[in-house]
């Protein structure tokens, strides 16, 4: 009924995950287990469980409702497992990695929903080896028209722009359903939680977020499904995107992002769905289907980019198809664009671009291709 966590587990581990860093008393504290309980909050600052300096903590078969934060990890932890939990309808964050040192954490087989400040949030700290798999993660943002920067999964070091000690890398987000809220079944003119995302990576200029895999997820119904700023070496593969409002994917100020083998489809809705890259280098978008993007912006937009490969993409029933602006050293090959909206262009490459190589593409509608933007090649 009061502020703070219902359960606070405080250990003494100050080392890493290496056995050489353990003190004898740490082994006596190892693997604290919280299992088979329900926690209900009755205070605005009531939390569920806090983990501090633990080694091998396991939270399993636990329900947390009506609290502020569900599971709050603080200061330093190692080898944490959160599994088979229900973190539901909390005013804060479901699983909160709060500016801590944490390597090795698994979050799996859990329902994390309706937590209004984010589902799984990693903010600052030094975090490595985060695995999120087999979860249903939904509507972890405001439930009304309040603007937000949170996400169902938020990984954010942008709040410490001058501090290189705070960094996040080595993340796997696999096999989850991640969705809501934007406007799944509401009126077209209303957007719930504008600015929200399913997955948001927010890095910083002095230290990008890096080495992230996003694979095998079902993603839908947020302002931007995946939003990436200042990251490198990110693999986005074999995901199903639908019902965005307005964007499926936005990537800015990033390098070596690979987007491959995905399906992009609004399903029964009319949605824009744009895939947008700005100020990015050496990325690949390939082997994906892009269907019925109802937008004048362009289905796939590159703005101020360099060194891209677009290959094996199928666009059907979209507004404008591929749009390039101030982009250079880019190859577009084996792409097929058909049934583009009347008056829209399959591809637009104006004279702000340079050294663009086209090879083996099939365009069935209008095209705008300035010869001065093209690379010198016999295939042009």
Give short role names for the model-derived ranges.
Residues 333-380:
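Leucine-rich solenoid repeat scaffolds
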Residues 37, 62, 85, 90, ...:
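Consensus "Asn ladder" position of solenoid repeat domains
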Residues 2-6, 43-49, 68-74, 91-97, ...:
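Short glycine/acidic-rich loop motifs that flank beta-strands on beta-rich extracellular proteins
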Residues 23-115, 144:
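Right-handed parallel beta-helix
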Residues 1-33, 40-56, 73, 157-162, ...:
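Extracellular beta-strand-rich solenoid/capping regions of secreted or surface-exposed proteins
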């Amino acid at each position: 009924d009061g502020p703070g966590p219902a359960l606070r587990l405080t250990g003494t581990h100050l080392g890493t995950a290496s056995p050489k860093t353990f003190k004898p008393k740490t082994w006596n504290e190892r693997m604290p287990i919280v299992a088979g309980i329900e926690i209900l909050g009755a205070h605005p600052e009531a939390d569920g469980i806090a983990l501090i300096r633990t080694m091998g903590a396991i939270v399993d078969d636990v329900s947390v409702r009506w609290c502020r934060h569900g599971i709050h990890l603080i200061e330093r932890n190692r080898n944490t497992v959160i599994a088979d939990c229900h973190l539901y309808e909390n005013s804060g964050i479901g699983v909160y990695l709060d500016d801590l040192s944490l390597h090795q954490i698994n979050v799996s087989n859990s329902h994390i929903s309706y937590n209004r400040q984010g589902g799984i949030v990693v903010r600052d700290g030094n975090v490595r080896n985060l695995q999120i798999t087999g979860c249903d993660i939904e509507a972890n943002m405001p439930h009304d028209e309040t603007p937000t920067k949170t996400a169902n999964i938020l990984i954010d070091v942008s709040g410490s722009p001058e501090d290189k000690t705070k960094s996040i890398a080595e993340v796997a987000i696999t096999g989850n359903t991640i969705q809501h809220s934007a406007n799944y079944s509401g009126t077209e003119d209303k957007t719930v939680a504008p600015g929200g995302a399913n997955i948001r990576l927010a890095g910083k200029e002095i230290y990008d977020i890096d080495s992230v895999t996003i694979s095998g997820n079902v993603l839908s119904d947020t302002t931007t499904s995946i939003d990436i700023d200042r990251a490198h070496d990110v693999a986005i593969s074999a995901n199903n995107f639908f019902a965005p409002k307005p964007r499926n994917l936005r990537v800015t100020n990033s390098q070596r992002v690979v987007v491959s083998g995905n399906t992009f489809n609004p399903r029964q809705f009319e949605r824009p769905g744009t895939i947008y890259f700005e100020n990015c280098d050496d990325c690949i978008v390939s082997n994906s289907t892009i269907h019925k993007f109802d937008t004048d912006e362009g289905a796939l937009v590159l703005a101020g980019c360099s060194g891209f490969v677009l290959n094996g993409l199928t666009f059907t029933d979209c507004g404008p198809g591929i749009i390039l602006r101030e982009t250079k050293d880019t190859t577009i090959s084996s792409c097929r664009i058909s049934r583009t909206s009347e008056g829209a262009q399959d591809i637009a490459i104006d004279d702000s671009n340079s050294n663009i190589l086209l090879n083996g593409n099939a365009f069935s509608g209008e095209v705008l291709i300035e010869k001065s933007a093209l690379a010198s090649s016999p295939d042009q």
